[in-house]
Design a protein with these regions (language model features):
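Hydrophobic ligand-binding cavity/cleft-lining segments
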Residues: 1-46
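Short, conserved beta-turn/loop elements at beta-strand boundaries and strand-helix junctions
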Residues: 85-90
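Hydrophobic pocket/interface hotspot
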Residues: 25, 35, 59, 81, ...
Length: 158
């Protein structure tokens, strides 16, 4: 697993090799039930309200805190799919639903899937991270989420 973050550009890049074929890993980003099962970082659960996996399609979801100290946490967000190439690349926008000025703005997330001898190298590049979120926290969140994704898709009979 590799990762880097930049406070200057408000961006992060995280990579991980997942022992599964690119198409299986790609599909886990676009299946609502599967996406909700791995995307929220530890301490959170997610509900996907809608997900239209087509160019120009939109998605909306909410993260909920599931631990005592996070019990009151609820954050909704969504965006639009800009590019979808099965097993190769996903590009989408992402924006939080918040009145807080430090949470404003649209992020762009680019995910690439490259077949490697051990499976698939997944690289996530997220840019335009809101002021309220330190890029190091976004990096940690993606690292955690990709770890959960690996557990789920690697545990499927090929």
């Amino acid at each position: 697993m590799t990762g880097e973050s930049s406070s200057e550009t408000r961006s992060v890049t995280v990579s991980r090799v997942i022992e599964a074929p690119p198409e299986r890993v790609y599909d886990a980003f676009l299946d609502p039930e599967m996406f909700a099962s791995w995307y929220p970082p530890t301490g959170y659960t997610a509900e996907v309200h809608h997900l239209e996996p087509e160019v120009g399609g939109t998605y909306r979801m909410t993260f909920y805190g599931d631990a005592d100290e996070l019990a009151d946490f609820e954050q909704s967000f969504g965006g639009t799919y800009r590019e979808l190439s099965r097993g190769e690349r996903i590009v989408y926008t992402d924006a939080f639903e918040s009145d807080e000025p430090t949470m404003a703005g649209e992020m762009t997330v680019t995910i690439t899937f490259v077949e490697v001898p051990d499976g698939t190298e997944v690289t996530v590049h997220q840019e335009g991270i809101p002021e309220a979120i330190p890029p190091s926290d976004a990096n940690a969140g993606w690292t955690d989420s990709l770890g959960t994704l690996a557990e789920i898709v690697e545990d499927v009979d090929a």
